[in-house]
């Protein structure tokens, strides 16, 4: 990326109640956005790489439950059911490379990356916003400049084996796999398994001698960076990689 450019992928945790506010913003269901610099006349230019087919986010979630594709077994009432991943790049990066069309290609690939993490069916909505004006850059360049970014709302699931208990009457079945479910679980989905390394490439350990693992979102940033760089959608011109922040 050019000097001063940065990219970011951050993940927020959302409950069934909390996701409704995000839905209204992402899907432009509000009548006005006084503090968001949203130009509703440009909202038709927003790009959905995945939509709900007319359902609300919670209705889509319930549909997957009803179809037996996900499970909320054992979750508390106010549990995290959704993730919102926001992928963002500073405004000038796209403006210098063709603006809207370049951003659309960039974020389509970011969406494909997210499909690899969550599974496409578990992604409820993925929309690139093209209607939020960047007032500072607009003033600097003397023309309307819009800030392109991607909102992805997804369901974090992990594959879980349910085994027959020791109380099963059939001794041959005890301890064997009864069924495999896609369990909704933010904590398990984002449990880090990548060791932290020191400057010498050695595994970092805590005071008890246990391995210290990298923060999962840091790993996410690196993987997204590598994915987009391999497709030549991120260009490195300086000797160090772009600043990836969470």
Regions found by a protein language model. Name each.
Residues 1-237, 241:
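N-terminal nicking endonuclease/strand-transfer module with a His-rich metal-binding environment
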């Amino acid at each position: 990326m050019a000097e001063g450019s940065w990219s970011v992928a951050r993940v927020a945790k959302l409950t069934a109640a909390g996701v409704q506010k995000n839905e209204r913003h992402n899907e432009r269901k509000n009548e006005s956005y006084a503090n968001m610099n949203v130009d509703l006349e440009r909202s038709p230019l927003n790009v959905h790489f995945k939509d709900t087919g007319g359902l609300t986010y919670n209705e889509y979630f319930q549909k997957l439950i009803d179809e037996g594709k996900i499970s909320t077994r054992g979750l508390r009432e106010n549990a995290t059911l959704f993730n919102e991943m926001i992928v963002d790049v500073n405004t000038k990066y796209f403006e210098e490379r063709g603006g809207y069309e370049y951003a659309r290609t960039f974020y389509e690939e970011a969406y494909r990356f997210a499909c690899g993490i969550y599974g496409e069916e578990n992604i409820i909505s993925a929309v690139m916003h093209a209607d939020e004006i960047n007032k500072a850059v607009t003033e600097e360049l003397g023309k309307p400049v819009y800030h392109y970014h991607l909102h992805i709302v997804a369901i974090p699931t992990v594959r879980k084996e349910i085994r027959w208990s020791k109380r099963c009457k059939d001794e041959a079945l005890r301890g064997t796999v009864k069924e495999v479910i896609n369990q909704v679980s933010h904590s398990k989905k984002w449990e880090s398994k990548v060791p932290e390394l020191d400057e010498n490439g050695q595994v970092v350990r805590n005071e008890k001698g246990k391995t210290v693992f990298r923060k999962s979102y840091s790993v996410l940033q690196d993987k997204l960076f590598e994915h987009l760089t391999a497709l030549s959608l991120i260009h490195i011109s300086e000797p160090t990689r772009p600043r990836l922040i969470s």
